[in-house]
């Protein structure tokens, strides 16, 4: 668990680089967040929910393939008691941010991610439907949702509401064996900056929205402690801003999903839809980690089904109007007669 951290942005008007003070229990440090509007006010950063690479100890639900099919109501997700609206996404909206001047608009990853989010909720999508059993506004600890409460739903219009190439350099890439990865504070500040860019400067405009911040190549390398992605939230004058940190996954190849479903060239970008989809499905059911749906051990719907390669809940393809994309399964409390399990396609 990561404790919340409080940040105050100086100034009363939009600034080119707001200077903020990060206060922790041990130190106070001045940091610059380039382009962060002062109107964002004080920022409070919350814990992230991490997706670890294949084979990382403790990442996968113990013996995932077996657990996916094992009838056990004790495995089910429970409601965390968060405020409604805002614990789940009733009308999801995605804003895609390519952060860093190293990005090229011709990089195939940029079009792959856009097409993936553009295709969801359209023809052929029986994958996001799995999430619609979850809700908000029920008692803490509930494992089911009555018909009369707000459920996870579909978007108003297209899911992908905007795309932004932010050509600010977020951090120094891998140099001389030293990996300088943007901190959770820097990533959260970029999400708030993106909210301002898209005009979402009220709490209401961010209640259902999430910002997928994609990093360019050079910010992810194999080693102890690295992750494939995470999602989190940051509180600001714009409300609570939910976001995903999505690194350039092909920097570590199959460890974060490349060719996990499709062989050869067809699977080059598998990781981006598997991991991007993992974080998306977690965010719409747990917008602010642990306020929505997770199990007694803190695992969210996609964590419980990560990297299953065979049997019930195995990763597979999702064919949409915009293309074919590799995705993983997510947890359903209603599967197996209420015992729960990992489901790729809603029945």
Specify the residue positions occupied by each region the protein language model found.
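Metalloprotease/metallohydrolase-associated module, dominated by Zn2+-dependent proteases
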Residues: 226-270, 286-347
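Extracellular structured ligand-interaction cores
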Residues: 74, 91-93, 208-210, 269-271, ...
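Acidic glycine-/aspartate-rich tracts in secreted/extracellular proteins
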Residues: 102-103, 218-220, 289-290
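N-terminal carbohydrate-binding/catalytic regions of secreted carbohydrate-active enzymes
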Residues: 31-191
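Flexible, surface-exposed loop/gating regions in the mature catalytic domains
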Residues: 134, 139-270, 283-286
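Structural motif marking the loop-to-transmembrane transition
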Residues: 3-4, 269, 273
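Active-site recognition of the HExxH zinc-binding catalytic motif
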Residues: 96, 274-286
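Secretory targeting and sorting signals
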Residues: 1-29
């Amino acid at each position: 668990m990561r404790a919340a951290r409080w940040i105050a942005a100086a100034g009363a008007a939009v600034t080119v680089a707001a200077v903020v003070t990060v206060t922790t229990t041990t130190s106070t440090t001045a940091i610059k967040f380039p382009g962060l509007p002062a109107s964002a006010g004080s920022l409070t950063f919350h814990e992230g929910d991490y997706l670890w690479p294949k084979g990382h100890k403790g990442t996968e639900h113990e013996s995932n393939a077996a657990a996916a099919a094992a009838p056990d109501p004790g495995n089910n997700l429970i409601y965390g008691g968060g405020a409604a609206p805002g614990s789940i996404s009733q009308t999801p909206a995605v804003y895609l941010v390519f952060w860093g001047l190293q990005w090229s608009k011709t990089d195939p990853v940029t079009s792959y991610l856009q097409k993936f989010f553009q295709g969801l909720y359209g023809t052929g999508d029986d994958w996001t439907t799995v999430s619609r059993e979850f809700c908000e506004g029920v008692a803490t600890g509930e494992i089911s949702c009555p018909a009369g409460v707000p459920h996870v739903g579909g978007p108003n219009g297209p899911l992908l509401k905007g795309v932004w190439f932010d050509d600010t350099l977020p951090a120094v890439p891998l140099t001389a064996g030293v990996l300088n990865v943007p901190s959770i504070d820097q990533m959260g500040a970029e999400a708030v900056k993106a909210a301002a860019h898209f005009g979402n400067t009220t709490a209401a405009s961010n209640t259902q929205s999430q910002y997928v911040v994609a990093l360019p190549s050079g910010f992810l390398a194999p080693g102890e402690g690295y992750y494939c992605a995470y999602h989190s939230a940051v509180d600001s004058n714009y409300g609570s801003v939910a976001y995903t940190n999505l690194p350039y996954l092909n920097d570590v190849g199959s460890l974060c999903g490349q060719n996990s479903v499709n062989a050869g060239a067809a699977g080059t970008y598998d990781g981006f839809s598997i991991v991007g989809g993992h974080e998306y499905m977690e965010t719409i059911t747990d917008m602010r980690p642990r306020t929505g749906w997770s199990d007694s051990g803190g695992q969210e719907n996609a964590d419980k089904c990560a990297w299953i390669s065979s049997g019930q809940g195995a990763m597979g393809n999702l064919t949409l109007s915009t293309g074919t994309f590799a995705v993983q399964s997510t947890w359903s409390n209603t599967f197996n007669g209420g015992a729960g399990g990992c489901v790729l396609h809603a029945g």
